[in-house]
């Protein structure tokens, strides 16, 4: 294993925390949700996690739309089941959401500097973006606008994107959270201005009686991500695995710990022996080895810090709920893990 490529960073201002988007709670009905909580392991730390089998993206998925998901920073939200949402009414939903955004803009709410009131929303089904056949189909939402003073015939540009997903969801949990009138798409990915996010979220809450919550990622879940993603055989975007640790001192400092992909892969191969699942003990052992190696070089106990970011060849994730998908090959597997976190984050 190579020595870490980075040491302790310079102090930085930590006073500005990320603002949380707060949506209006429309009083989501409790039908079926209490029983779901009683019979499913919500918020319990798992002792093992199943490794989703590699499944290529369906040919029904538009490659251009999949490309829109890659290499962008997405903010994560969890969403309660939507009441009376229909895949057959997407055009009508697009019309209503467009009207809602334009109405909010006319009230003086800023959407984006340099755009006209001519804003429109589109809803696109992504039926192939699923890990199993029984997973609900994903929905891509885009908000488009013409730049101010643009030439005649200029194309609209995308100013905001959002995607509802439910990939590799636990079948028993999914059965409990869905019905003839409830659709469970618990993971919501957002790329765009916070003002537009609030407008879209508010409209969905009023239209489908659902509620949104920020989806932070705990240090423990980041550790699971690092272990599970290290085991994937990436072929298209191979980079060093990097960990960012937050040091609980003032002024605030971060520690960056980068490891060659072959080194961490070899370490994980010596630890992980199963084919279908990853054990919590294996995750613990991986980080014990990393901590020991780092202490040998810098005499710093990383166990006294907080893991806040993980970057691998497959994806990167930050504790404040920011994610980048870096591999089309393993997009479904990453979405599957995030779907699990989103379901566990739903408040009842």
Swiss-Prot record:
Q: Which family does it belong to?
A: Belongs to the CENP-L/IML3 family.
Keywords in alphabetical order: Centromere, Chromosome, Nucleus
Q: Which domain of life is it from?
A: Eukaryota
User: Which protein are we looking at?
Assistant: Centromere protein L
Q: Where in the cell is it found?
A: Nucleus; Chromosome, Centromere
Task performed by this protein: Probable component of a centromeric complex involved in assembly of kinetochore proteins, mitotic progression and chromosome segregation.
Q: Name one GO cellular component term.
A: chromosome, centromeric region
